Amino acid sequence: MSLCISDYLYLTLTFSKYERQKDKRPYSERKNQYTGPQFLYPPERIPPQKVIKWNEEGLPIYEIPGEGGHAEPAAA
């Protein structure tokens, strides 16, 4: 949709007046939108299989917890 402002200048509207409407619900209803069983408790974290430590050269060294050994270093 274009509006003619002068003989050579047109104002182009890139959105509809119906797209940008104020949410007319009260605050209590908008707040309750993000409550429920899927938002109450965060999911359980997956325990890490490797621990990343950095050496003096700035390269990562992967250690497997519990074994104390080193995994293969990262490829450069």
Swiss-Prot record:
Keyword Transferase: no
Keyword Phosphoprotein listed: no
Induction: Constitutively expressed. Not induced by bacterial infection.
Keyword list, A-Z: Antibiotic, Antimicrobial, Fungicide
Origin superkingdom: Eukaryota
Chain's role: Displays antimicrobial activity against the Gram-positive bacteria B.subtilis ATCC 62037, S.aureus ATCC 15752 and S.mutans ATCC 25175, the Gram-negative bacteria E.coli ATCC 27325, P.putida ATCC 17426 and Serratia sp. ATCC 21074, and the fungi C.albicans ATCC 10231, C.neoformans ATCC 34881 and S.cerevisiae ATCC 44774. Does not possess hemolytic activity.
Protein name according to UniProt: Antimicrobial peptide lumbricin-1
Organism: Lumbricus rubellus (Humus earthworm)
Native organism taxonomy: Eukaryota, Metazoa, Spiralia, Lophotrochozoa, Annelida
